[in-house]
């Protein structure tokens, strides 16, 4: 893991080079504070250096307007004012005049200087900030710009009463902003790394090198005891030395095929601020969750109606569709409870649950964000596995209970007639077909008791189990912050997880373009852009997961692939899949 990946994981504002920074990207860096009213970005105006240049040039012009005799007489000894003016120009702009006299700037040169003042890339404070992004540096930049704007407003004349009133309002707003910045400056202070060095030792984490990272630092060394023993002891020592609470991460950093253990230290106030900004447990977040839940229930109800036989009445809808609806909600409910219980066991806070409505399967799963730090890789692995495993088990339990209650595989009295495309070209279901036979024809092209032009009779609860398996497998794809992406990050690290995420996005795109699958297109876009990225690092990424969790990961991967990957041979005849069967496609 390189240090650049750490910057991406833990800081909102970062840049690879000051030469590529723009005013737009700078404003993004400072939006970190706006939610808590610590600062608001204001445009950079002309600085005092430009005013000094203008003043110096004005003095030079006045000296040239003096009598020629006095000007020639000054050859033996220059006027003190001219000398001071020349030094001011030289100090502000780095221009050296060999004769010691004033040099009149052209209009183009002045415009260029003004543009440099407006351009944030010429700001030295900004350059230092981009070299090491930190909240303290951002506050200093905003405070400097607020002071500059206040001075600029104070110099403007109040000839127009209305303009004076507006300037007064702006001045008051800037003054309040400056007060907030001063308050934030007292809260967010960069840690003194020299003081922190003495906190590391042979009995905790032996540090051999340190480098600045944000307002904290990265200590390179090696761990001497298990993380669960070292972290509380070291956090207490560092907090006492720094005078503020801190948060620690223990990670492995790879450079030039050499793996080193590192301990990253950051002020706790800054991490709390970052978590506060991304928190979805707000009134708007809960309102959005309710709106998505209502929409998802509607799509499940609409999708369920597609499987009724022609000429079905409302009573048929109630008797046939409600079991499917209840089965789907059972899968979602059980998996949600398992997820939250597992997260609570590790002390991880979860955001509200956001259902993903779908016109194909009714629902494409549930989204949750982590609203607190993950203590270790076990938490990063166990929480998504709890959701996936519970959803799989509930789906299978529903299907088995439906078959047992019906006493057959025909769907019973209230069977849904499911389009065969839900079973087509899938290795897992093809295997099920081979086991449960007999087939309806000699060629083995259809499921038992299938009715051509109507579909395959399936019990509603059994079909809910099938949909639950498919939706769970979609969420197990190793892409972004889907459950599968989180599992991949826990098992293989962020670097390998990023490669798997990219490969999965490409595969989904290929399925959409080559195979013409709308589901691949929609899910690929959702997984890449809505749930893309990676989770914030766990505080302990050094302690290994153990072979048992790798085995569980392999089992889930096999089930996911068997459920989603097509098999080349197929199971159905082209006539059975063609018109006039379809009443709506996937």
Swiss-Prot record:
Q: Which domain of life is it from?
A: Eukaryota
Q: Which family does it belong to?
A: Belongs to the peptidase M50B family.
The principal localisation class reads plastid
Summary of the function given for this chain in its UniProt record: Probable membrane-associated metalloprotease that may be involved in chloroplast development.
Q: What is this protein called?
A: Probable zinc metalloprotease EGY3, chloroplastic
The residues forming a coiled coil are: 103-195
A single GO cellular-component term from the record reads: chloroplast membrane
In the bilayer, the protein is annotated as:
Multi-pass membrane protein
Q: What class of enzyme is it?
A: hydrolase
- The encoding gene is EGY3
Transmembrane segment boundaries: 287-307, 318-338, 389-409, 427-447, 454-474, 506-526, 550-570
Mark out the transit peptide.
1-54
Q: Which GO terms describe its molecular function?
A: metallopeptidase activity
Q: Which organism is it from?
A: Oryza sativa subsp. indica
Keyword Glycosyltransferase assigned: no
Q: Where is the composition biased (Basic and acidic residues)?
A: 62-73
Query: Where in or outside the cell is it found?
Result: Plastid, Chloroplast membrane
Alphabetic keyword roster: Chloroplast, Coiled coil, Hydrolase, Membrane, Metalloprotease, Plastid, Protease, Transit peptide, Transmembrane, Transmembrane helix
């Amino acid at each position: 893991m390189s240090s650049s990946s750490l910057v991406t994981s833990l800081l909102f504002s970062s840049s690879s080079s000051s030469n590529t920074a723009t005013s737009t990207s700078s404003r993004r860096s400072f939006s970190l504070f706006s939610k808590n009213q610590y600062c608001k970005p204001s445009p950079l105006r002309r600085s005092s250096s430009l005013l000094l240049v203008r003043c110096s040039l004005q003095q030079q012009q006045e000296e040239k307007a003096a009598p020629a005799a006095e000007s020639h007489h000054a050859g033996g000894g220059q006027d003190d004012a001219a000398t001071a003016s020349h030094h001011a120009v030289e100090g502000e702009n780095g221009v050296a005049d060999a004769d010691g006299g004033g040099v009149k700037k052209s209009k183009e040169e002045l415009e260029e200087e003004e543009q440099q003042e407006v351009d944030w890339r010429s700001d030295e404070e900004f350059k230092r900030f981009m070299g090491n992004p930190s909240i303290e540096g951002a506050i200093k930049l905003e405070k400097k710009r607020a002071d500059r704007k206040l001075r600029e407003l104070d110099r403007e004349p109040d000839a127009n009463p209305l303009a004076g009133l507006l300037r007064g309002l702006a001045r008051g707003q800037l003054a309040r902003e400056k007060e907030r910045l001063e308050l934030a400056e007292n809260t967010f202070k960069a840690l003194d790394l020299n003081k922190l060095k003495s906190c590391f030792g042979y009995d905790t984490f032996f540090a051999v090198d340190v480098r600045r990272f944000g307002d904290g630092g990265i200590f390179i060394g090696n761990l001497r005891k298990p993380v669960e023993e070292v972290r509380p002891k070291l956090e207490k020592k560092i907090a006492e030395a720094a005078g503020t609470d801190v948060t620690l991460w223990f990670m492995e950093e790879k450079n030039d095929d050499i793996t080193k253990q590192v301990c990253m230290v950051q002020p706790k106030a800054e991490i709390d601020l970052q978590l506060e900004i991304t928190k979805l447990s707000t009134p708007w977040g809960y309102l959005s969750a309710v709106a998505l839940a209502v929409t998802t229930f509607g799509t499940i109800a609409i999708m369920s109606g597609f499987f009724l036989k022609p000429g079905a009445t409302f009573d048929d809808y109630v008797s046939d569709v409600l079991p499917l609806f209840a089965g789907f909600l059972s899968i979602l409910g059980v998996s949600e409870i398992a997820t939250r219980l597992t997260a609570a066991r590790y002390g991880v806070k979860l955001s509200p649950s956001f259902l993903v409505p779908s016109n194909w399967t009714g629902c494409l799963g549930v989204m949750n964000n982590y609203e607190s730090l993950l203590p270790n890789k076990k938490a990063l692995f166990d929480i998504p596995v709890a959701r996936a495993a519970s959803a799989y088990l509930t789906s299978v339990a529903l299907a088995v209970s439906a078959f047992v209650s019906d006493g057959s595989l025909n769907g019973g009295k209230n069977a849904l007639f499911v389009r065969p495309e839900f079973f087509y070209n899938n290795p897992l279901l093809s295997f099920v077909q081979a086991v449960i036979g007999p087939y309806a024809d000699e060629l083995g092209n259809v499921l038992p008791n299938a009715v051509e032009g109507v579909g395959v009779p399936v019990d509603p609860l059994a079909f809910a189990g099938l949909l639950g398996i498919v939706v769970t497998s979609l969420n197990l794809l190793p892409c972004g912050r889907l459950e599968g992406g989180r599992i991949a990050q826990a098992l293989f690290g962020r670097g390998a997880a990023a490669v798997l995420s990219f490969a999965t996005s490409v595969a989904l795109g290929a399925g959409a373009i080559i195979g013409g699958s709308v589901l691949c297109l929609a899910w690929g876009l959702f997984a890449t852009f809505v749930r893309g990225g990676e989770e914030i690092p766990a505080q302990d990424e050094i302690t290994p997961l153990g072979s048992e969790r790798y085995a569980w990961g392999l089992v889930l991967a096999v089930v996911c692939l068997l459920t989603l990957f097509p098999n080349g041979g197929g199971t159905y005849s082209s006539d059975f899949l063609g018109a006039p069967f379809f009443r709506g496609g996937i």
